[in-house]
Amino acid sequence: MNTNQDNGNQLQRTMKSRHLFMISLGGVIGTGFFLGTGFTINQAGPLGAVLSYLVGGFIMFLTMLCLGELAVAFPVSGSFQTYATKFISPAFGFAFGWLYWLGWAVTCAIEFLSAGQLMQRWFPHIDVWIWCLVFAALMFILNAITTKAFAESEFWFSGIKILIILLFIILGGAAMFGLIDLKGGEQAPFLTHFYEDGLFPNGIKAMLITMITVNFAFQGTELIGVAAGESEDPEKTIPRSIKQTVWRTLVFFVLSIIVIAGMIPWKQAGVVESPFVAVFEQIGIPYAADIMNFVILIALLSVANSGLYASTRILYAMANEGQAFKALGKTNQRGVPMYSLIVTMAVACLSLLTKFAQAETVYMVLLSLAGMSAQVGWITISLSQIMFRRKYIREGGKIEDLKFKTPLYPVLPLIGLTLNTVVLISLAFDPEQRIALYCGVPFMIICYIIYHVVIKKRQQANRQLEL
């Protein structure tokens, strides 16, 4: 399979290890982290929430190990879509590629919509769709200049988020153990909220149900694979970035959950608008709500920035594989696939539908479209690594020649594949998440049909012409 393009249509390898790490964090630390943690604590209880995030982190760890082997062996911009086409089947690669592209393009729309709603706190008289247009234009410019401009902007977006999270963990932890006085002279809670109503107040089953939400919270870390095609020295930068992303993401998430669960009673955690705001207000930090509104706004734009980059590169790679219009596989003089960027942004501008419909209605429809793609992506990564290793050994390849090896093969990849599949199946048992299956499954079936009716026949005809 041809993964290289003509000299005039190539991406540029300008990303360093720090860029890859921040791009991955940019995709994962969003509203699900800043707003969704309270729901997890409320449902699973304090200890149950911590355990849920540890298990979710373990699934992320297994998936990223599989991605590391593939991305080092094949550092291409198509990443797991290219791997799926080559090692699973062209039909699956086609269907998954379009699902994953649509998922991230729609995620951009969701982030623009959420950002517009946040701006109404400060500018209530300006319509949401106007802010959507402003933020869409900003993200388009950052992605259109150069790949390095995108990477640098994402580096600083993610840096702001990390700084706030570190301050939250330090200040919240200090207040939790009485090192900082609480507002109103309240006593430090220490660890009382973890055991005052029992270790699992809603039972083990409640903790298992929250795994669906928790696993989605970690998704976005796989963007390292998409950026591999534009990274300097991928054999060194990708393994380093994967290790940094896995451990630092897990530490940020788990320590934040411990602080929130320690500071806020679990019954109240799902009621407050943002648990981060509630903790900052307990400590007595002025303008806590406005500060977090700004941080969440940055988080939204960061996710949109990473998502626009990822979906553009997936579409670009598919075009060069004959799975999308050929023009989408071209880059400009700066190495930016502009046509793919324009098409992706056109889908992301679905957020502008808020001019004609209620913002909440548009949000739910877009969220259902985006819901399944990332989970299918993790399954695809695990399965592609298993199929790649089998083919590699069958064709006489030596394991010691692989620059990055998934340890304990095939045990860890199979565990990752199984756990990711269980999470996907679990969507059917959650009424709020079930709509993701209703949208995602028919979409993939339609893509399969299109591949066999149109794409496969066209590729066969092209091969015959070449002969």
UniProtKB/Swiss-Prot annotation:
Molecular function terms from GO: amino acid transmembrane transporter activity
Lipid bilayer topology: Multi-pass membrane protein
Pfam families, alphabetized: AA_permease
Signal peptide: none
Gene Ontology CC terms, in alphabetical order: membrane; plasma membrane
Cell membrane is among the record's keywords: yes
Cellular compartments annotated: Cell membrane
Transmembrane stretches, start-end: 21-41, 47-67, 87-107, 122-142, 162-182, 207-227, 246-266, 283-303, 336-356, 361-381, 409-429, 435-455
Name of the protein in its database record: Amino-acid permease RocE
Species, as recorded: Bacillus subtilis (strain 168)
Gene name tied to this protein: rocE
